Amino acid sequence: MADQITSATATAKTVRIAARKARLVIDLIRGRDVAEALAILEFTPRSGSPIIEKVLKSAIANAEHNYDLDAQNLYVSKAYVNEGPTLKRFRPRAKGSASPINKRTSHVTVVVSEKEA
């Protein structure tokens, strides 16, 4: 029984949201039931909520389809956001100068696991 897979992962790479903002949302769902986590994400008014909700649904689908795990028995075991590449842009300013603008991206990873019996 030790060789049976009990977790599934989903990752979204180079998502156009700052890692700092996405971490505010990801901290809300870590360690929770998947049903509870989906409810939290649905009613959280932050820009990262729809992105993280999509990744969580993908992780649940991976668990069901790839590993035949029961969705009712899953919880968010790991959830983290890493910084992705930064897109560097410039905004024109007065007297021919320019100010840098950093468009930050993130890599979002969600791991769901089966609860211990």
From Swiss-Prot:
Q: Does the keyword Calcium apply?
A: no
**Cited Gene3D superfamilies:** Ribosomal protein L22/L17
Q: Name one GO biological process term.
A: translation
Tell me, what is one Gene Ontology molecular-function annotation carried by this entry?
rRNA binding
User: Can you cite an annotated GO cellular component?
Assistant: cytosolic large ribosomal subunit
- The answer on whether this UniProt entry bears the keyword Cell wall biogenesis/degradation reads no
Question: Can you name this protein?
Answer: Large ribosomal subunit protein uL22
Task: Provide the species name.
Answer: Lacticaseibacillus paracasei (strain ATCC 334 / BCRC 17002 / CCUG 31169 / CIP 107868 / KCTC 3260 / NRRL B-441) (Lactobacillus paracasei)
